[in-house]
Each structure stands twice: as structure tokens, then as C-alpha cells.
């Protein structure tokens, strides 16, 4: 069932929702980012990953500086409508460190 942007609960977390970014082919988790309404609208309009930077308080497109863009193939919404998954085709590493994904450190 397709959801509308108006159904996403941005207010639960102060105007943003978490976005899990996964490789469309392997389903490997690449990163966790955040989206507000505007970045989600840009993602749907352009087909590229756009997010809200909590530390810089601004919109950013994945790959705008590095060239490592993510073509969004599908957006999934969780049952509470307050979290998203972007299934993407990455053009390069997801992590700013150059690692394929942002989860390359182990805690246990």
C-alpha cells in the first residue's frame, strides 16, 4: 500500500524521521540518516537521497561533494509511519570515511 507524505509522522521526533539506507540489491545497511518533509519531497522528486543534517541544520544530498550519490529505487514506511527505509543503488561508498557502509566498527 502506497503512503502519502502527509501520513509520515514527522512531529514525533521534532520534524524529522530516521532513514535506514540499504543497498537495493544486497539489502546491506549502508547508513542511518534523517529526513524532514522537504528532504523527503526532494528525494521523491529527484530520485536521489536527500537528508536533513542535524549537526549542520541544513538539507544535504548524499554525494553532493563526494560524487557518491545514491539512486533511490524504493522508499518503505514502517508500521508507525515514523521511520523510513531507502533502497538505493549507490555509486560509491556510503560513509564519509570511504568505507562502503557507516557500520564498520564493532561493539560486541
UniProtKB/Swiss-Prot annotation:
Q: Name one GO cellular component term.
A: cytoplasm
Claim: Lipid biosynthesis is one of the keywords in the record = no
Q: What is its main location?
A: cytoplasm
The note describing how and how many cofactors are bound reads:
Binds 1 Mg(2+) ion per subunit.
> Mind telling me which InterPro entries this protein's record contains?
PRA-CH, PRib_AMP_CycHydrolase_dom, PRib_AMP_CycHydrolase_sf
Record's keyword terms, sorted: Amino-acid biosynthesis, Cytoplasm, Histidine biosynthesis, Hydrolase, Magnesium, Metal-binding, Zinc
Q: In which pathway does it act?
A: Amino-acid biosynthesis; L-histidine biosynthesis; L-histidine from 5-phospho-alpha-D-ribose 1-diphosphate: step 3/9
Gene3D superfamilies membership: Phosphoribosyl-AMP cyclohydrolase
Keyword Cell inner membrane listed: no
The reaction(s) annotated as catalysed by this protein in its Swiss-Prot or TrEMBL entry are:
1-(5-phospho-beta-D-ribosyl)-5'-AMP + H2O = 1-(5-phospho-beta-D-ribosyl)-5-[(5-phospho-beta-D-ribosylamino)methylideneamino]imidazole-4-carboxamide
Task: State the superkingdom.
Answer: Archaea
| GO MF assignments | magnesium ion binding; phosphoribosyl-AMP cyclohydrolase activity; zinc ion binding
Residues where Mg(2+) binds: 78, 80, 82
GO BP terms, alphabetized: L-histidine biosynthetic process
Which cofactor names does the annotation list? Mg(2+); Zn(2+)
Q: What is its quaternary makeup?
A: Homodimer.
Protein name, UniProt field: Phosphoribosyl-AMP cyclohydrolase
Organism name:
Cenarchaeum symbiosum (strain A)
Q: What gene is it encoded by?
A: hisI
Amino acid at each position: 500500500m502506497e503512503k502519502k507524505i502527509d501520513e509520515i509522522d514527522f512531529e514525533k521526533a521534532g520534524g524529522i524521521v530516521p532513514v535506514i539506507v540499504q543497498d537495493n540489491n544486497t539489502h546491506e545497511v549502508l547508513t542511518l540518516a534523517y529526513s524532514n518533509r522537504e528532504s523527503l519531497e526532494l528525494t521523491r522528486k529527484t530520485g536521489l537521497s536527500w537528508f536533513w543534517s542535524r549537526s549542520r541544520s541544513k538539507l544535504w544530498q548524499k554525494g553532493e561533494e563526494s560524487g557518491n550519490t545514491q539512486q533511490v529505487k524504493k522508499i518503505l514506511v514502517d508500521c508507525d509511519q515514523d521511520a523510513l527505509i531507502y533502497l538505493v543503488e549507490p555509486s560509491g561508498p556510503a560513509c564519509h570515511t570511504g568505507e562502503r557502509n557507516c557500520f564498520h566498527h564493532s561493539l560486541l
